[in-house]
Amino acid sequence: MKLLSVLALSATATSVLGASIPVDTRAQKFLIELAPGETRWVTEEEKWELKQKGQDFFDITDEEVGFTAAVAQPAIAYPTSIRHADAVNAMIATLSKENMQRDLTKLSSFHNRYYKSDYGKQSATWLQQQVQAVINSSGASRYGAKVVSVRHNFVQHSIVATIPGRSPEIVVVGAHQDSINQRSPMTGRAPGADDNGSGSVTILEALRGVLQDQTIVQGKAANTIEFHWYAGEEAGLLGSQAIFANYKQTGKKVKGMLNQDMTGYIKGMVDRGLKVSFGIITDNVSTSLTSFIRMVITKYCSIPTIDTRCGYACSDHASANRNGYPSAMVAESPINLLDPHLHTDSDLISYLDFDHMIEHAKLVVGFVTELAK
């Protein structure tokens, strides 16, 4: 997630030595894209310097030769009315703050979740085990639901859970699982409770809720559903780029992608005297999908929205957008009021509001069900 004006408020990060994969990237160069057509070769250290200045980017070093970013997306007709209120409300009733607190306590206990560290690998393995357990306990695995690791050229893997539907067209919800201490990426303590442990456990709890519905569990929903947990977001949207580039190359159809990056911090709004709200990202997203999401929020959530801008390549929805798939993002607040502790050793669970995270989980359940069922 990006820093922007949050930078000025960020706490000082402390470097703590820990086990890691000994990778020397000081001399290695990476090709990044900072805006459409604006590319630059940088070292890993220069990547983090850009991030500290609030500059986001795609790392396109491993992009296929001849890749062309999408300039337009296919026209998709989204529902204009709510059709599955009874089913969604039944799912929402099962959402549990206690589950989210338990999962986030564990996820943020890893020394860090840096994409090149042993800890990043261990945390991804633990997270995938939780996803598999949810699928198994729901009985969905008997109808073809599965979770797979998506391997990259770094140690942390991405995770994709698939619940088949009657159509191969996919409804995607995603969140990045990695964390970073920008002062000491490889070895520094980076609990990443909000960025983005909060989004990761939000969609995990939403998956539990969605799999309470037997129509979905038994593969009878109109569309296929996928939940994604991306590796390497902080280093340039690496995991999500790889996944959506593969989907483009193999001709997969994505009806819509909703990104959840930071879902738990409300103090910035409270301190300003603002009503606690969702931050609806309005730039580099699908306007029609975002309009559909506004309808879902109005129906199923108890808080309003504030429009906000995130910038180019600010989070994983941008990877879907770049590959021609309609995407949207809803954040915990307006971007200028995000958690000031992100990317430090102070991004702790104690700063988060689980009632707010439940609102995000309600949104995810409503989004998936109304679009897929």
Curated annotation (Swiss-Prot):
SUPFAM superfamilies attached to this UniProt entry: Zn-dependent exopeptidases
Gene3D superfamilies per the UniProt record, alphabetical: Zn peptidases (3.40.630.10)
Chief location: secreted
Residues modified by glycosylation: 136, 196, 284
Top EC category: hydrolase
Keywords carried by this UniProt record: Aminopeptidase, Disulfide bond, Glycoprotein, Hydrolase, Metal-binding, Protease, Secreted, Signal, Virulence, Zinc
Location(s), subcellular: Secreted
Gene Ontology BP term (one): proteolysis
Disulfide bond sites: 310-314
Cofactor note: Binds 2 Zn(2+) ions per subunit.
Alphabetized PANTHER family for the sequence: AMINOPEPTIDASE YDR415C-RELATED (PTHR12147:SF56), METALLOPEPTIDASE M28 FAMILY MEMBER (PTHR12147)
Descriptive protein name: Leucine aminopeptidase 1
Gene: LAP1
